[in-house]
């Protein structure tokens, strides 16, 4: 039965992606958005909708006057919008491997930070890019490859293995070099930096469970320390980057100034300091477009407590 479910999962993903790539873009966005919104139909503790609402409550509460809570109706509305945006993300990812260079360039605009890219390149080495789960970062990665900044990016392993292999092939077609998340991922990233390439890490979720404690949207949690560790060990600049989806089916990228990665103490202390600085930049990025934050898993200790209570 497990093999049948795995096969069905593989066929569902691959056939849907093939369909998205062969229909008009507007149709693909509508279909994918509709399918994704079905995820929001289930409510209650521990569901994707509930997790999105918890994350957005923190995001909006961080902008409120102390003691004032965000409007629950507003939180629900924004949370449901994330599913539509998530569908658009999947539709874009399905057609991106088949896009021409002209198509990729025409639908991407680097709104801010080209000077940071050029300054990092002038140093004669690669650099580290840290991103949140916002918008369509793969589109930015494909554009970077065309601009001469090829990216080696960490990718969470998926099950079944043939589905993971399919996703790897898709990202290679985008100009990205995927590396499975795990103990062996640092080697390829370091080699990419030494080859004057980009090491990309999506860093707003501690998927392994061995992250660095930070305050993120006013609450203690852990975030991955990999980006900070790589920058400290290689001397590469650490650039926070975000790619938003914009009206008219195009994408808007921003490269922020490099974080201060000066060695000031022990490696552990410096990684903690830099990761906290990165968390503050991510807060700013996410606040600008909270509806594009695709995070439906527990990300704070209190989220795990709620999920555990729901299962009980």
Q: Which residue stretches match the model-derived regions?
A:
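Membrane-anchoring hydrophobic helices of lipid-metabolizing enzymes
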Residues: 1-128
């Amino acid at each position: 039965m497990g093999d049948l479910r795995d096969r069905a999962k593989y066929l569902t993903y691959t056939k849907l992606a093939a369909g998205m790539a062969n229909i008009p873009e507007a149709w693909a966005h509508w279909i994918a958005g509709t399918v994704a919104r079905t995820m929001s139909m289930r409510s209650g503790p521990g569901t994707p909708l509930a997790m999105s609402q918890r994350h957005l409550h923190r995001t909006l509460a961080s902008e409120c006057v102390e003691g004032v809570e965000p409007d629950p109706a507003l939180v629900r509305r924004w949370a449901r919008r994330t599913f539509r945006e998530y569908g658009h993300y999947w539709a874009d990812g399905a057609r991106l491997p088949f896009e021409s260079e002209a198509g990729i360039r025409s639908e991407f605009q680097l709104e801010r930070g080209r000077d940071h890219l050029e300054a990092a390149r002038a140093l004669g080495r690669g650099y580290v890019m840290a991103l949140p789960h916002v918008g369509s970062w793969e589109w930015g990665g494909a554009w970077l490859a065309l601009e001469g900044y090829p990216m080696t990016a960490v990718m969470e392993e998926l099950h079944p293995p043939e589905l993971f292999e399919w996703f790897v092939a898709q990202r290679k077609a985008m100009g990205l070099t995927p590396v499975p998340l795990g103990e062996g991922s640092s080697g390829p990233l370091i080699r990419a930096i030494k080859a004057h390439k980009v090491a990309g890490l999506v860093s707003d979720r501690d998927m392994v469970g061995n992250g660095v404690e930070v305050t993120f949207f006013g609450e203690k949690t852990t975030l991955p320390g990999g980006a900070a560790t790589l920058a400290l060990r290689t001397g590469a600049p650490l650039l926070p980057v975000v790619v938003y989806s914009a009206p008219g089916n195009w994408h808007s990228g921003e490269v922020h100034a490099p974080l201060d990665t000066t060695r000031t103490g022990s490696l552990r202390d410096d990684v903690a300091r830099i990761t906290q600085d990165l968390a503050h930049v991510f807060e700013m990025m996410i606040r600008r477009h909270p509806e594009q934050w695709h995070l439906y898993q527990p990300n704070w200790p209190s989220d795990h407590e709620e999920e555990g209570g729901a299962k009980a």
